[in-house]
Design a protein with these regions (language model features):
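Cytosol/matrix-facing amphipathic helices and coiled-coil assembly/linker segments
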Residues: 1-14, 73-155
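Internal alpha-helical transmembrane segments
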Residues: 1-72
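Transmembrane alpha-helical segments and their cytosolic interface motifs
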Residues: 18-37, 141-167
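Alpha-helical transmembrane spans of integral membrane proteins, capturing the lipid-embedded, hydrophobic core
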Residues: 57-58, 155, 159, 186, ...
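Alpha-helical transmembrane segments of multipass membrane proteins
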Residues: 60, 64, 161, 165, ...
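Structural signature of hydrophobic alpha-helical transmembrane segments
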Residues: 175-187
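Interfacial loop-to-transmembrane junctions
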Residues: 191-216
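Juxtamembrane boundary at the C-terminal end of a transmembrane helix
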Residues: 223-233
Length: 233
């Protein structure tokens, strides 16, 4: 039997918060470590400097992504909490005005003036703050961010993504390593694009094109910088 709970669970929007952080982390891990390695490889004749730079970049990048995601999402959560507290205060100080605002919101969505007011009254009697949080502020259980979840998803995904180019660095020939890294990275990005598109229910073709174009630009510029300095390590 279909209920509102199991029906909503089947939608992709429930995955949006952690999926965004995970895709960002994995994409950044693949491109950052590959670009860093390509830049060093373009100016190096030995494997050790490439490995050292890549491992350092992997550790620093994963911690930076996790910390940055946590701080960013926490700021969003703090803003939401501040708005909720403000709304609760306004409901106590000017309940009639808040009721009229709620009715106007429903009226703009297509209800008649009388029906909109009736809906606003009934929702206010049941849970006034919840109604205003949801319909006036646009905050709900699905859209609310989770700082810890986002930080873990982003940091873990960066690490996993960064391990793929690191394997190439460890086993590919030093001569021409840039080309090995580029090819393997593009393949990894395509796989990531497919997984992200399937998980989020979006277009696979668009995801692949978007992710490979930006990946190619990042690695190309990194290789250019390495060749530009041309310093042999």
């Amino acid at each position: 039997m279909i209920t509102i709970d199991n029906y909503l669970d089947s939608h992709y929007i429930h995955r949006s918060n952690w999926l965004r952080a995970a895709v960002l982390g994995a994409n950044d891990g693949i491109i950052s470590i590959s670009s860093l390695a390509i830049g060093v490889a373009a100016a190096s004749s030995s494997r050790e400097p490439i490995i050292l730079a890549s491992v350092a970049g992997l550790v620093a990048g994963a911690l930076s992504m996790a910390a940055g995601e946590y701080v960013s999402v926490s700021s969003q959560t703090d803003t939401e909490k501040a708005d909720i507290e403000r709304e609760a205060k306004e409901l106590k100080e000017m309940p009639v005005d808040e009721l009229n605002i709620l009715a106007q919101i429903y009226e703009r969505r297509g209800l008649t003036k009388e029906t909109a007011m009736q809906v606003a009254i009934e929702l206010t009697e049941k849970d006034a703050l919840g109604a205003h949080i949801r319909d006036e502020l646009g905050i709900n259980e699905i859209s609310q961010a989770n700082p810890i979840q986002a930080a873990i998803a982003s940091g873990t995904a960066f690490t996993v993504g960064g391990l793929f180019p690191l394997l190439v660095i460890l086993f590919a020939p030093v001569k021409g390593m840039e080309y090995w890294l580029y090819g393997f990275t593009i393949l990894s990005l395509i796989i990531l694009g497919v997984i992200a598109a399937k998980t989020g229910g979006s277009s696979i073709k668009k995801a692949i094109i978007r992710i490979t174009i930006w990946g190619t630009l990042a690695m190309g510029l990194s290789a250019f910088v390495g060749y530009l300095f041309g310093i042999r390590v």
